[in-house]
């Protein structure tokens, strides 16, 4: 039973790729057709690869893997944070700071500073400091929380990285590859899939598409951690829904539409 139905993918707009002139030829085998200058992703393949990604993430979580969710563009930021928190994992949803993984020691020092400022506020230190100094500390804390708040409690370098739009997050992907961290990613038609270990061919520019895929991978983590199928009821319901009978229906849906 597929973890995501064709109907769900269609409704979320997962099939819309980029303009044909912006494509990466290495994504050709994941593209079904082209309509009005837009590539249409083969959702039959998306269903298959989403299943593989789900299994990979579930098995990793069952082995107590630390998973880092990465998505810094506005279409991904909320879903990445919400689903990482829901699944008990960690996230970066603003600008990726170079060296976040490859210079982990320095990042840990900045996180320690963030925690120190928080303690200063909690233990009353702020009350005896000059207002200007408190204002500077609050500004520093806000900046640190913005960029590092999602990994503040991450116990170690992640065992798995999930990325929305690896084309945009190239630095993050390169750091993961350098450290041998497997990367699971939503891969759109403008992206080179070669650096991704577990791909999900999908529209990574639509909020609903990002939310759907990201939530399913969070479900996989929850299932892996619980040691049971925590989303069996939801999956059964999805399977009972009316689904697209064939890939040709996708063409009918997207005829005349643009990304």
UniProtKB/Swiss-Prot annotation:
Pfam families: Ribosomal_S2 (PF00318). One of its GO terms (cellular component) is cytosolic small ribosomal subunit. Keywords: Ribonucleoprotein, Ribosomal protein. GO terms for molecular function: structural constituent of ribosome. GO terms for biological process: translation. It comes from the Bacteria. Disulfide bonds: none annotated. HAMAP family: Ribosomal_uS2_B. Belongs to the universal ribosomal protein uS2 family. This is Small ribosomal subunit protein uS2. It comes from Streptococcus pneumoniae serotype 2 (strain D39 / NCTC 7466). The gene is rpsB.
């Amino acid at each position: 039973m597929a973890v995501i139905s064709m109907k769900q993918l269609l409704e979320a707009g997962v099939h819309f790729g980029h303009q044909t002139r912006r494509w990466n030829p290495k994504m050709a085998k994941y593209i079904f057709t082209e309509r009005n200058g837009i590539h249409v992703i083969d959702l039959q393949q998306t269903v298959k690869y989403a299943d593989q990604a789900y299994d990979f993430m579930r098995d990793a979580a069952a082995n107590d893997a630390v998973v880092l969710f990465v998505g810094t563009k506005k279409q991904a930021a909320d879903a990445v944070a919400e689903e990482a928190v829901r699944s008990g994992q960690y996230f970066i949803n603003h600008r990726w700071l170079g060296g976040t993984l490859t210079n982990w020691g320095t990042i840990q020092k900045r996180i320690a500073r963030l925690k120190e400022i928080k303690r200063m506020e909690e233990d009353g230190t702020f009350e005896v400091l000059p207002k200007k100094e408190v204002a500077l500390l609050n500004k520093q804390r806000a900046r640190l929380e913005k960029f590092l708040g999602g990994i503040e409690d991450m116990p170690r370098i992640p065992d798995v990285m999930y990325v929305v739009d690896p084309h945009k997050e190239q630095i993050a992907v390169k750091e993961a590859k350098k450290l041998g961290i497997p990367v699971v990613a939503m891969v759109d038609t403008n992206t080179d899939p070669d650096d991704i270990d577990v791909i999900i061919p999908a529209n990574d520019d639509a909020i609903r598409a990002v939310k759907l895929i990201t939530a399913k991978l969070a479900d996989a983590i929850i299932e892996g951690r619980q040691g049971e199928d925590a989303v069996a009821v939801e999956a059964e319901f999805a399977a009972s829904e009316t689904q697209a009978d064939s890939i040709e229906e996708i063409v009918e849906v997207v005829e005349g539409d643009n990304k």
